[in-house]
Amino acid sequence: MNRLNLFSLRSVIDQFSVKSISRWKPRRLSSFRHPPDPERIQQFSIPKGIFGQPTCHTHPHLISHGNLTCGVTQLEYKERRETLVSKLAEAENLHKTHVIVIPAARKQYMSDKIPYVFRQNSDFFYLTGCLEPSAILFMIKPADRDTYKTILFVHEKDSHAELWEGPRTGCSAATTLYSVDEAQPVENFNNFMHRTISSLKPVVLWYHNESPANPDIHDVVRSSLKQGHASLEDPQKFLHQMRVVKSPAEVELMKETCYIGSQSVNMAMACTKPGISEHAVSSVFEYTCRMSGAEHGAFPPVVAGGPRATHIHYVANNQLLQKEDMLLIDAGCQRWLYNSDISRTWPVSGKFSAHHKILYELVLAVQKRLIELLGEQRPPLDQLFDHMCRLLGLYLQQEGILPKNIDANELIGRAYRLCPHHVSHYLGLDVHDSPLVRRRIPVTNNMIVTVEPGIYISPDDSSVPPEFRGVGIRIEDDVLITDGHPLILTDTCVKEVNDIEAIVGKQNV
């Protein structure tokens, strides 16, 4: 297999995108929900030194001066904490003391001493901007007071541990870096938690008890509950309600990751030819993402040729592509923990067959109409799914793929069997973002959702004409809800038939 020729590939991509990947650089991002208060900004500063994560001093090519993480200030993280504390106290009881415990993720290992790439707990990161494992955010709001205290438990500096695993921030710098009231070693948390809970009553302990981010912390919290007089409540519903509506800084971060993902899918198209493997196409996508500024993929990609595309979560990606195949890719990338999620389908030969073109344009028409509906009606995502089933059934019937002698309800049911997955989910720090926010509420400004209709016809599906069998097609874009028409964040990823045919196979791998 020949080495990927990036120089010739650039000219291919330039024809179909707003900007060239080779010239792409991270933008310096806005970070405020509203005009900043100069007096509040003066309270914050990023200390100089080598810490447990990049800073604007050590990585100015990634983080603008004054920001804690890419595009987001200390002030914004603090405002998020203030909002959460206020929401929780109002929801339960203002006359009780409220204790909030949000643990960071801990390192995970695939085998002895071999770690997985660390991925921070999204809720913890959203509130702190801290990227260190096994830390703990502790907040306490005394009864009948407007103030609250924030304590961050982190690993203390340790020269031996840092020799092996890299720098730690330590307690001394953590207070300033993360703009918290106090920082303590994680080893103190057990005794601190027991003392705090046992000395307070009545107290509401806010902690996510299901699928804990850190089992060690989970055990401490559970044991402290037995000793004290606390009632247990889950903060995650309130956190997800906050997270589902993106700040201006988050919108910019999502634009970046969606742009990178879009260009990487374009490049995967350009490298597709009969005879190469699904794995090779997957590798081109991942390589382009990383070279363009993403840390890694958002999830294991689906790269499914031919009838394998009828298996919705096919991730083996180990078969060779045939000339007559359609290729479905469902992939995304992660940049500063924010995710893109894109699906495209194209002919391996670079030319749609007549029957493949009918199916593809049918799915594309459904997707375009659903995006229009998001702007016109702002429906709940569950209602958008109902629209998809109705439109898909109607269009399939018009093309003669489904019979004309069935009523509307049966038609919707047949469409659902051909596309059994939901048409949309929220997107952000997690691919399936804010899962506790129901999909039956209307969408609002600054939500980001996917729109991903598909059709999957197995090779042995005798209910459709033979020429349409053994094909899976999905088209997915990431969409920002605005006052006007929804903004498609993945609009540089080609999806029109003519554009696809112009780009597929134009680069050797």
Which role fits each region the language model picked out?
Residues N2-L9, I13-V509:
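Active-site neighborhoods and metal-handling regions in enzymes and metal-associated proteins
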